């Protein structure tokens, strides 16, 4: 009798993706930070879009729009806090991801490492332009 997770078409996809994933035995929890970066980035984009629907950048009404988001919009307070704390979590994951690369010697792959450094500088410049300057 065959195992259903290896013979059923839907279960076979799940089995190959999660259970019998061909990864080395030396993989550790440090390798999860790339996935966490994707989750944090998706959260930032979604909460940022929803917050931008109610925010006005006019200097006279900006504070009023933030209080409107927190008080009048359904779950607006949680969107604001998710967006603020998600940015911190994104950078924590980003620095841990770079630290993992330094620890495991990924800088020897110069092309991949240089692209990563360019992305790091682009993310830091975007954060500076979007959060520090306004």
From Swiss-Prot:
MF term (GO), any: metal ion binding
Signal peptide, first to last residue: none
Cofactor note: Binds 2 heme b groups non-covalently.
Main location: mitochondrion
GO terms (BP aspect): mitochondrial electron transport, ubiquinol to cytochrome c
Classification via Pfam families: Cytochrome_B
Keywords: Electron transport, Heme, Iron, Membrane, Metal-binding, Mitochondrion, Mitochondrion inner membrane, Respiratory chain, Transmembrane, Transmembrane helix, Transport, Ubiquinone
Subunit note: The cytochrome bc1 complex contains 11 subunits: 3 respiratory subunits (MT-CYB, CYC1 and UQCRFS1), 2 core proteins (UQCRC1 and UQCRC2) and 6 low-molecular weight proteins (UQCRH/QCR6, UQCRB/QCR7, UQCRQ/QCR8, UQCR10/QCR9, UQCR11/QCR10 and a cleavage product of UQCRFS1). This cytochrome bc1 complex then forms a dimer.
Function noted in UniProt: Component of the ubiquinol-cytochrome c reductase complex (complex III or cytochrome b-c1 complex) that is part of the mitochondrial respiratory chain. The b-c1 complex mediates electron transfer from ubiquinol to cytochrome c. Contributes to the generation of a proton gradient across the mitochondrial membrane that is then used for ATP synthesis.
Protein name (record): Cytochrome b
Lineage: Eukaryota, Metazoa, Chordata, Craniata, Vertebrata
